[in-house]
Design a protein with these regions (language model features):
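Residues forming the flavin
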Residues: 1-246
Length: 246
């Protein structure tokens, strides 16, 4: 068993991925042209230096706190969990980064989130207009905001809270989204920092999910290749079909 473990570990791991991103709360009706035939969708923007992808889109939903490994992040809640909807829509725009080890990835993400949390369940909120003008959002500035936050947090300035990558990625994405829906994103849109998604290290596998150890397959998220329930299930069906024909 030890020799099998050693063979599997030696040179088997590639990179570890971690996603961080701003959670966006906007007017629900602005994306109706995209969502008229589906409950949610994934939108992805390819930039020269990054890829930004929407995650966990919740039309008429709310934003809640997510507690994970001692970290507190903004997350989305389906409106059906409360029985009534809101005029808002929320999603996270994730941008992945890759590290040589799981430890490096976790240190990078947790340090950013912990700095925001400040030892409690602190989450920072900023108006889109304020972000674009590089000024902090204040309590007074929120009094007349037409989009009401579904989660209470500290109003502030994302520029001093998170790395520029996630701000620039959001700005680029929203610009393309405006072109796509052919209307400007409401400047009262609210931005919550910061959501995160952690992954297992990517393991070297072939096209059939088989590792360097003959006959040992990794199905689902443990491979670091699939990243959701549907992808994990699909990989299981794929490998099962392959095994039934060999």
């Amino acid at each position: 068993m030890y020799r099998l473990y050693h063979r599997f570990q030696t040179g088997s791991q590639e990179q570890t991925r971690v996603d961080l991103g701003i959670r966006v709360e906007m007017k629900e009706h602005q994306l109706r042209s995209i969502l008229k035939d589906t409950f949610e969708t994934k939108l992805s923007y390819e930039h020269e230096h990054f890829t930004a992808t929407t995650y966990c889109m919740n039309p008429k939903g709310r934003i809640i706190r997510k507690y994970e490994e001692g970290l507190v992040m903004p997350d989305g809640q389906n409106f059906r969990e409360k029985g009534t909807g809101t005029p808002n829509l929320n999603f996270t725009l994730f941008i992945p980064r890759y590290f040589s080890t799981l430890k490096e990835a976790n240190i990078y993400a947790s340090s950013i989130i912990k700095n925001i949390n400040q030892g409690r369940d602190r989450i920072v909120i900023q108006r889109l207009e304020d972000l674009l003008n590089e000024k902090p959002t204040t309590e007074d500035g929120m009094k007349h905001n037409r989009i009401h936050p579904t989660l209470q947090g500290d109003y502030g300035d994302l520029h001093v809270e998170i790395p520029p990558l996630y701000i620039e990625g959001l700005k680029e994405f929203l610009l393309r989204l405006e072109q796509f829906i052919q209307e400007p994103i409401d400047k009262d849109t609210l931005l919550y920092a910061i959501d995160g998604k952690f992954y297992a290290p990517t393991i070297k596998i072939n096209n059939f999910f088989e590792t360097s150890v003959h006959g040992l397959f990794l199905v689902g998220d443990c491979s670091g290749v699939t990243h959701s329930l549907s992808q994990a299930a699909a990989s299981g069906l794929y490998v099962g079909k392959y095994l039934s024909h060999i």
